[in-house]
């Protein structure tokens, strides 16, 4: 029992609160009054020592007494703290009030000082205005007094001096105007010289462009001629094959009917369908032979020359047909390709050189314009020169693009030439029967092949010629556009 009572009473008295609130102090004070009242009352006669847990009760009572003493001491200490805090708060309030009063007083003093300064400034301004008026009045009075004191002969001298000063100012203005007129005349002359120089350059460029257009037209005419030759060669091959097939069928019929009669093939009369006549050339746009800058007229002129001067198309020499009947199918394909390769290479190189010359002239003009811009001081002239320079730079960029395209096209043409040289050519034989068999085996006469040969897409050289035609047309269009922009 003693151990149980110790565990129940003692642990609750070891840990007590360090700080207590006012309500706890009030409850403690009420308890003290109650305990003091209980002390006056006589307790019941009870013997604690006779109780079974007397030791525990005695120890608990002792701890209670100690705790009560501690609480009373803490209460007094807390009361002292509260009084000190209230005093400190009052002092702090007094200090704050004194600071507020001092700040208000300082603000009032500052406003009063500002008002005083403003009043003083207004008074000073008024005095200054009055003094200025007085000074003006005194000046007028002095001038009037001088005029009255001076004699009469001094007045015209003063007028003469004034007139002289006015004349000098006018003469100076006239000199300035004359200098400006001279400067404007010089600028006008320089602008006229520049305009003449630019007109000369324009005429030179127009001539060069016309020459380039003529060269491009010649290239196109040569390409058209090559295409026409290819189509005519394909039509000749097809007609020759048909004629040879008919001959073979006729010979077979003749051999079956008359075995004794044996005529050599070489003594047969030459076929009239081997070479087309001048009117059978694939030419539709008319037959005028006058020279002009248009492409159709140039093509007509070339075809007229071919019809009247070419030994291949003319039917005056039938020996050429009789002696070499087997070389023409292979040779008719090789000749236009050689012509086309030589003509295209020369024209491309000429066009490239002309474009490079134009680019060099443009670069020289660019340098001259930069020098003029550095030398000129007039803003309007400088703006005009800067505009010309911008336009020149754009033209140079266009020319450089054209040169790059032409160089690429030259490389493509060179590659196509190499591939065409590497391709094996058909061997030329003398026997007509073998030629017929080879032609029948390799080149069957179908409508698709005829169409390809007529269009000029059967060989890589014809493709190259078509590409060159497109590039030349593009160059012509760009040159025409450049002419229009330059005239603007």
From Swiss-Prot:
Residues 71-226, 377-403 form a coiled coil. Interacts with clip1, mis12, ndc80 and zwint. Interacts with gamma-tubulin. It comes from the Eukaryota. The lineage of its organism: Eukaryota, Metazoa, Chordata, Craniata, Vertebrata. Required for spindle microtubule attachment to both kinetochores and centrosomes. Also functions to tether minus-ends of spindle microtubules to centrosomes. May act by forming ring-like structures around microtubules, or by serving as a cross-linker or scaffold at the attachment site. It is found in: Cytoplasm, Cytoskeleton, Microtubule organizing center, Centrosome; Chromosome, Centromere, Kinetochore; Cytoplasm, Cytoskeleton, Spindle. Keywords: Centromere, Chromosome, Coiled coil, Cytoplasm, Cytoskeleton, Kinetochore, Microtubule. This is Centrosomal protein cep57l1. Residues 452-464 have a biased composition (Polar residues). Belongs to the translokin family. GO terms for biological process: attachment of spindle microtubules to kinetochore. Residues 232-272, 311-342, 416-464 are annotated as: Disordered. InterPro entries: Centrosomal_MT-associated, Cep57_CLD, Cep57_MT-bd_dom. The keyword Oxidoreductase does not apply. Residues 259-270, 314-325 have a biased composition (Basic and acidic residues). Residues 241-250 have a biased composition (Basic residues). The gene is cep57l1. The keyword Cytoplasm applies. It comes from Xenopus laevis. GO terms for molecular function: gamma-tubulin binding; identical protein binding; microtubule binding. Its main location: cytoplasm. GO terms for cellular component: centrosome; cytoplasm; kinetochore; spindle microtubule.
């Amino acid at each position: 029992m003693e151990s149980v009572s110790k565990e129940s009473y003692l642990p609750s008295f070891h840990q007590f609160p360090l700080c207590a609130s006012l309500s706890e102090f009030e409850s403690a004070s009420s308890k003290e009054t109650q305990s003091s009242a209980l002390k006056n009352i006589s307790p019941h006669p009870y013997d604690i020592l006779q109780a079974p847990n007397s030791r525990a009760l005695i120890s608990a009572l002792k701890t209670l007494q100690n705790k009560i003493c501690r609480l009373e001491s803490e209460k007094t200490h807390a009361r002292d703290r509260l009084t000190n805090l209230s005093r400190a708060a009052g002092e702090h309030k007094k200090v704050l009030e004194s600071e507020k009063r001092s700040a208000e007083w300082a603000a009032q003093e500052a406003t009063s000082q500002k008002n005083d300064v403003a009043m003083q400034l207004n008074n000073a301004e008024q005095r200054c205005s009055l003094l200025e008026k007085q000074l003006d009045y005194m000046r007028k009075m002095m001038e009037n007094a001088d005029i009255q004191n001076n004699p009469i002969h001094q007045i015209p001298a003063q007028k003469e001096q004034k007139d002289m000063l006015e004349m000098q100012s006018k003469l100076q203005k006239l000199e300035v105007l004359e200098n400006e007129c001279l400067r404007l005349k010089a600028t006008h002359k320089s602008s006229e010289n520049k305009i003449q120089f630019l007109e000369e350059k324009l005429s030179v460029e127009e001539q060069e462009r016309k020459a380039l257009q003529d060269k491009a037209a010649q290239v196109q005419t040569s390409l058209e001629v090559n295409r026409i030759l290819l189509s005519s060669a394909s039509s000749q091959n097809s007609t020759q094959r048909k004629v040879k097939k008919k001959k073979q069928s006729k010979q077979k019929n003749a051999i079956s009917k008359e075995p004794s009669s044996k005529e050599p093939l070489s003594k047969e009369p030459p076929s009239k369908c081997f070479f087309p006549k001048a009117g059978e050339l694939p030419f539709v746009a008319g037959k005028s032979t006058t020279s002009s800058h248009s492409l159709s007229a140039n093509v007509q002129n070339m075809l007229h020359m071919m019809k009247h001067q070419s030994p291949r198309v003319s039917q005056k020499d039938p020996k050429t047909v009789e002696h070499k009947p087997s070389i023409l199918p292979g040779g008719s394909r090789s000749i236009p390709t050689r012509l086309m390769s030589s003509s295209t290479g020369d024209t491309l190189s000429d066009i490239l050189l002309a474009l490079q010359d134009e680019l060099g002239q443009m670069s020289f003009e660019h340098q001259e314009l930069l020098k003029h811009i550095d030398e000129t001081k007039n803003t309007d002239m400088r703006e005009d020169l800067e505009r010309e320079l911008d336009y020149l730079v754009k033209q140079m960029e266009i020319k450089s693009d054209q040169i790059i395209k032409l160089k690429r096209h030259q490389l493509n043409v060179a590659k196509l030439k190499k591939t065409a040289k590497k391709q094996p050519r058909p061997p030329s034989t003398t026997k007509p029967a073998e030629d017929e068999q080879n032609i029948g085996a390799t080149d069957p006469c179908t409508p698709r092949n005829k169409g390809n040969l007529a269009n000029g897409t059967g060989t890589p050289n014809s493709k190259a010629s078509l590409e060159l035609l497109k590039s030349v047309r593009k160059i012509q269009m760009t040159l025409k556009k450049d002419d229009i922009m330059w005239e603007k």
